[in-house]
């Protein structure tokens, strides 16, 4: 029964507005307290922003940089609130983490022209893992509000030769838009997508881990954007066009009558008179 409840809960969360995930998640947990831990670990929530007091830069919060009630900043490598003996990446990974944050900072600026990004790395038995977080919220100009949250988790298995590695990418994107215009009223549109991809790639000075991961994330985000555009925006446009028309009812009837007259005229023209 609990497994069926979990499947139904996840299916419901996929269909509810992303901007209300936290509220809906709390409501679901109130209805089914036994699912609390599974729901919290399975449902991606919108990213929250904090500020690094040492560097004065924003960073994003998630389970991967959390230890207790404190969150580690990728810029200073410090926990806020301060925490003794918090989990830290190895020296090698910390160096890679710094490079990755600067690389994806440039990527975010190029593609999103603003927003906040953070990258966190941690050690695994046969390699390491990373999470790339990107958040861009609309400023509300032109009566449009919205937010994009993308979470990319990469598992890297380094081969014994050190020349190749296996990458497993799991990406989730959450997008919502809200328009409020006098002519059309208020409209909400949102959704989320999760996709996976695996590949092997060479590792060298000219093709390091950051470049390989960056290429996978870039390709995945482009695929997700195209899918969201086709499914959510394309289908919504078709539905709205089917519900509303720019023509008046009188014009539609006149156009239909004209089509019938043309069809009848063509039919009469094609019918040959019988010969005596």
UniProtKB/Swiss-Prot annotation:
User: What is the protein's major site of localization?
Assistant: cytoplasm
Q: Which GO terms describe its cellular component?
A: dynactin complex; F-actin capping protein complex; WASH complex
* Classification via Pfam families: F_actin_cap_B (PF01115)
Task: Give the function comment from the record.
Answer: F-actin-capping proteins bind in a Ca(2+)-independent manner to the fast growing ends of actin filaments (barbed end) thereby blocking the exchange of subunits at these ends. Unlike other capping proteins (such as gelsolin and severin), these proteins do not sever actin filaments. Forms, with CAPZB, the barbed end of the fast growing ends of actin filaments in the dynactin complex and stabilizes dynactin structure. The dynactin multiprotein complex activates the molecular motor dynein for ultra-processive transport along microtubules.
Q: What is this protein called?
A: F-actin-capping protein subunit beta
Does the UniProt entry include the keyword Cytoplasm?
yes
Instruction: Cite the entry's keywords alphabetically.
Output: Actin capping, Actin-binding, Cytoplasm, Cytoskeleton
